């Protein structure tokens, strides 16, 4: 197996309750849901939700027949499964650098509030492109290095890093901000066509959120999004996977979409395990396909 960059692991964390529920982020949640509803395709067959976590946004993808929730945290996926069930959803614990899927098995993918934890952006975007069909939709959100607060602090000499340079900045371990043009270039190199950049969360201020209703702030934000000023703390991008290979495995049944994250070879079901041709096994436990490490 090739060397893996550092991975941010939320295993066992209280991310849901420490960051979202009851933590004053209803405004951000509404804004993100609103953008997804605006730019998602009307329908689709199979969507990959990268960094799905506890399933906060998963119900926004009800227009897809099948949704695969992927996260590195097994415990986050356990909670998501308890809430969502199994009828339309598949749960996969894996790292996004080594996706355990065959090529071209998804006609949609999203990565929201996730890529800021990745130190090798080109590598993970290439991995995502490899499992998507041509002309499929990829929605990527990223933290914006060139936001108005960072630019102001830099101009006043209160910040050590320059928001105008293209290179990512790691302001806390495994927390990166990205220049919009850096992301644009990385998407292009990975095989995506960028169609739109949508700045969001212009009003991410503790004072405003304590003073004004979340719905009102989200409404103002939707107006500001139309300015396309890329100075907000967060930016959504709408992309399609380019290419003319006509390769598609989109109609494969659920179990048949998987491949070895080590070699890419086919996997066979053997009870509660998926097994490759070398005998390496990955376990299915608590209804979750566990590709974090081979089974003992």
Question: What are these model-predicted stretches?
Answer:
Residues 1-43, 56, 76-79, 139-162, 292-293:
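Conserved class I S-adenosyl-L-methionine
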Residues 1-17, 266-296:
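N-terminal, positively charged/glycine-rich alpha-helical extensions of SAM-dependent methyltransferases
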Residues 48, 52-98:
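Class I SAM-dependent methyltransferase SAM/SAH-binding core
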Residues 110:
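A conserved beta-strand element that flanks and buttresses the S-adenosyl-L-methionine
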Residues 122-137:
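A short glycine-rich, Lys/Arg-flanked "PGG" loop and its adjoining helix->strand segment in the class I
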Residues 153, 157-160, 182-185, 189, ...:
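A C-terminal cap/extension of S-adenosyl-L-methionine-dependent methyltransferases
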Residues 161-182:
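Acceptor-substrate binding/catalytic loop of class I
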């Amino acid at each position: 197996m090739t060397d893996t960059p550092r991975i941010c692991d939320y295993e066992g964390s209280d991310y849901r309750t420490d960051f979202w529920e009851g933590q004053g982020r209803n405004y951000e949640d509404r804004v993100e849901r609103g953008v997804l509803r605006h730019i998602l395709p009307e329908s689709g067959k199979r969507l990959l939700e990268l960094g799905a976590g506890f399933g906060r946004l998963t119900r926004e993808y009800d227009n897809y027949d099948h949704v695969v929730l992927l996260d590195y945290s097994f415990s986050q996926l356990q909670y998501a499964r308890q809430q969502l069930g199994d009828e339309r959803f598949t749960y996969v614990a894996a790292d996004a650098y080594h996706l355990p899927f065959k090529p071209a098995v998804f006609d949609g993918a999203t990565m929201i509030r996730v890529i800021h934890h990745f130190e090798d952006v080109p590598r993970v975007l290439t991995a995502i492109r490899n499992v998507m069909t041509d002309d499929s939709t990829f929605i990527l959100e990223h933290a914006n290095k060139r936001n108005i607060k960072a630019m102001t602090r830099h101009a006043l000499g209160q910040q050590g890093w320059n928001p105008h340079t293209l290179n990512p900045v790691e302001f806390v371990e495994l927390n990166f901000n990205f220049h919009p043009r850096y992301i644009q270039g990385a998407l292009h190199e990975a095989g995506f066509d960028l169609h739109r950049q949508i700045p969001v969360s212009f009003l991410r201020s503790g004072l405003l959120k304590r003073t004004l209703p979340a719905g009102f702030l989200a409404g103002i934000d939707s107006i500001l999004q139309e300015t396309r000023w890329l100075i907000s703390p967060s930016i959504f991008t709408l992309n399609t996977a380019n290419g003319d290979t006509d390769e598609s495995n989109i109609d494969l049944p659920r179990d048949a979409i998987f491949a070895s994250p080590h070699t890419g070879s086919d996997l066979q079901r053997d009870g509660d395990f998926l097994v490759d041709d070398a005998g390496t096994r990955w376990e299915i436990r608590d209804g979750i396909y566990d590709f974090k490490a081979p089974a003992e």
